[in-house]
Amino acid sequence: ASDVYKRQQYAFDPESEDYRVIEVNARLSRSSALASKATGYPLAFVAAKLGLGYGLFDLKNSVTKTTSAFFEPALDYVVCKIPRWDLGKFHGVDKELGSSMKSVGEVMAIGRTFEEAIQKGLRMIGQGMHGFVENKELVIPDIDKALREPTDKRIFVISKAFRAGYTIDQVHELTKIDKWFLQKLMNIMQTSKELRQLTIENGQLTMKKEVLATKDPQGNCQLSFVNCQLRKAKQQGFSDFQIARAIGYEGDMENGSLYVRKYRKAAGILPVVKQIDTLAAEYPAQTNYLYLTYSGVANDVHYLGDHKSIVVLGSGAYRIGSSVEFDWCGVQALNTIRKEGWRSVMINYNPETVSTDYDMCDRLYLSLIHISEPTRRTP
C-alpha cells in the first residue's frame, strides 16, 4: 500500500488473513516512482503541492493536462514490475529469495493483458530469456523442491512444471501463488502448444497435416486459422523468436524471427501505440506516456512524418556495472536535443530512472528495445 507520504510493504497470508509489516518508507521510493509511472499520476508533484497547502481539487494533473489531481486514475492496461537479479555474478551466493532485497534493478512492462505484460517483462530483464516459454531447457533435478523454495529462476521453474504436466492446483499447493496468476501463465503455455500445430512447408506457414485433417479437411480456413493463431500469440506477448521456435523453424533462429515478422506484417498483424492517460480514454488526454500493444486497432497518437525527431535508447534495467550514470547520459542527450530545437523521443522501461519522467522528453515509449519493437515507431 502506498500514498504520497509513506509506503508500506506487507506479507499477507491469504488463508489465515494474517499479515506482517516488512518495510515502511516515510518518503517517496522506487515503488512510488513505479506507481506514478504505471498510472500516469504525478505522485511527487502532487505530494509537494499538498505539503504547501493546496487541495487535490486545486491541482491540474500535469500528465493528462485535462483532469484535476482529485480524479482517480482509471487503467485500461496491465503493468508488471519484474526485478532483475544478478546473483550469478557472485560466487557462492544464496539464490533463495525471502523478505530481504537481493535484486539490483527492475523493469516495468505494459500490455493490454497480463500475459502480454509478463512476457514483455521477462524479455526486458535482459538475462537471456525470451518470455515465459520457448527458452533454453532448464535442468531441474527436483521440480517439487524448486517450486517450494523460491529462487531467481522460480517463474521458469513454473513453466517447466506446466510443460511436465503439473496442474494449476499442484503448482498452487507448492508455491502458494494465487491461482489467478497461474491460470494466466497456463494460458501462455496453452498458446505455445497451439503454435506447435503450425509448420513451414515450401516456405509457407501452414497447419500440420494431421491438424489440417481434423480441423479443416477441405483446407478452406487454413489461412484464417494460421493468422488467428499468430494474432493470439502476439496479443499474449509472444516475440517473433518465440513463435519461430514454437513452430519448429529449422536453421538460424534470427532468420526464423525475421521470417515470422515478414509473414505477420503481410497478414496485417501489427502493434498499435496507446497512451498511458490515467483516464482509460474517458476524456481526451495529451499525455506523452506511450506503449505498444497488439490488442488494438488504431494508434492513440498521430505522427507528423516531418523527420524532426531524434530517438534516444535508454539503458534498461540497472545491473551490476550499469546504473544511474548511464541513464544520466541519456537525460543529457534529451536535454541537448530539445535545446537544439528537435523533438526528443526516449525508449526505456526502467521506472527508477530520470529518463522515464514524463517531463524529460516529448515522447516516452515504455517499451522493449528490440528489432521487432522500435522499428514500428515513426516519431
Model-assigned labels for residue ranges:
Residues 236, 242-246:
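Extended, domain-scale alpha-helical bundle/helix-rich regions
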